[in-house]
């Protein structure tokens, strides 16, 4: 199995800045989830978690006055989740290459080996997540988790918090990272995700915004193919990319394909 990652030409060149041969690494930025995913998508995932809290309380006949369904999921005046000061950083991946990007800048599609990505996650404490689109299984999953987690978080008019052994913050993260609206099922999206403290990440200026990101280094053998989109518009680029990959000690003829 392979997964596809779309990158700009500039991002591709930057990712191989320190690459030197087939036994080395290339680096892609995992950007802050809140900065690259539409707000309504985040809110949809969290709304299903909130709905599952209500379903659990109905099942357990918890009085309305003791309900935790109205618990705030974000810090006040912030897009950061309540709980630890940890952010979610992702590289979007897809089961299919998708349509060419509508951009003035050339883009490439990287074909990445699923098994190699899985091994990377095991060794580096990343997560490779398959997005979920069906509402009922998501609600059932969250509600089942609440059997263990409901008593590990608290909420009243003055305080919101977690017990030391709580995994409710992980549920909040999963609602943001994994859940997508049913209408997006055709995306077949995966996410290579990293959770990092906000004071341990890097920042870059991009398209008028300040974007937090985490550099994720992958072994070169994780990369199976590089697809150049709409190459006929820029006939010089294919040969130049060929030379670029060779300059990094990589098998250009094996990696580079016309799309």
Pin down the residues of each PLM region.
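NAD-dependent ADP-ribosyltransferases
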Residues: 1-259
């Amino acid at each position: 199995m392979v997964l596809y990652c779309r990158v700009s030409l500039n991002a591709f060149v930057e990712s191989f800045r320190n690459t030197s041969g087939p036994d080395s690494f290339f680096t892609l930025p995992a950007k802050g989830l809140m900065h690259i995913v539409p707000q309504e998508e985040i809110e949809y995932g969290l709304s299903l978690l909130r709905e599952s809290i209500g379903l659990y309380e109905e099942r357990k006949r918890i009085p309305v006055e003791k309900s935790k369904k109205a618990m705030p999921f974000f810090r006040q005046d912030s897009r950061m989740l309540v709980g630890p000061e940890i952010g979610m950083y992702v590289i979007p991946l897809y089961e299919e290459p998708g349509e060419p990007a509508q951009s003035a800048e050339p883009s490439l599609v990287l074909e990445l080996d699923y098994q190699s990505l899985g091994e990377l996650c095991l060794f580096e404490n990343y997560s490779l997540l398959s997005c979920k689109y069906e509402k009922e299984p998501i609600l059932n999953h969250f509600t089942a988790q609440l059997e263990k987690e409901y008593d590990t978080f608290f909420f009243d008019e003055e305080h919101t918090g977690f017990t030391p052994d709580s995994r409710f913050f992980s549920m909040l993260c999963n609602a943001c990272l994994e859940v997508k609206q049913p209408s997006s099922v055709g995306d077949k999206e995966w996410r290579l995700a990293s959770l990092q403290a906000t004071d341990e990440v890097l920042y870059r200026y991009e398209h008028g915004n300040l974007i937090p990101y985490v550099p994720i280094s992958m072994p070169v053998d994780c990369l199976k193919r590089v697809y150049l989109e709409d190459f006929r518009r820029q006939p010089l680029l294919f040969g130049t990319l060929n030379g670029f990959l060779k300059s990094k000690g990589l098998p250009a003829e094996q990696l580079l394909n016309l799309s």
